[in-house]
């Protein structure tokens, strides 16, 4: 059995929770009729053990076992810190 662990990159949009962040993942989808590429956004709740992320940071996340009702992703690393 070769299960590949899913990893994604996105931008932090909320860090108001304790040990949790909300990450927005952007993807481009082709419109079925007109063919134009449209941006679609998915928001994921991510476990941030050390509270190291801030709003605007670009982060890498990976899928894990369910940690709560909405959290099943964990923070791997901060790719780029936000300039405030």
UniProtKB/Swiss-Prot annotation:
**Subunit structure of this chain's protein:** Part of the 30S ribosomal subunit.
> What is the purpose of this protein?
One of the primary rRNA binding proteins, it binds specifically to the 5'-end of 16S ribosomal RNA.
Quote the Pfam families the UniProt record gives. Answer: Ribosomal_S17
Keywords noted in UniProt? Ribonucleoprotein, Ribosomal protein, RNA-binding, rRNA-binding
Q: Which domain of life is it from?
A: Bacteria
Species the sequence originates in: Photorhabdus laumondii subsp. laumondii (strain DSM 15139 / CIP 105565 / TT01) (Photorhabdus luminescens subsp. laumondii)
Protein name, please? Answer: Small ribosomal subunit protein uS17
Family annotation (InterPro entries): NA-bd_OB-fold, Ribosomal_uS17, Ribosomal_uS17_bact/chlr, Ribosomal_uS17_CS
Q: Which family does it belong to?
A: Belongs to the universal ribosomal protein uS17 family.
């Amino acid at each position: 059995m070769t299960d590949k662990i899913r990893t994604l990159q996105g931008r932090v949009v909320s860090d108001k929770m304790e040990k949790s962040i909300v990450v927005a993942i952007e993807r481009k989808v082709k419109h079925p009729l007109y063919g134009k590429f449209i941006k679609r956004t998915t928001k994921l709740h991510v476990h941030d053990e050390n509270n190291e992320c801030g709003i605007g940071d670009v982060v890498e996340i990976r899928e894990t076992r369910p940690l709560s009702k909405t959290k099943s992703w964990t923070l791997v690393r901060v790719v780029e810190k936000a300039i405030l």
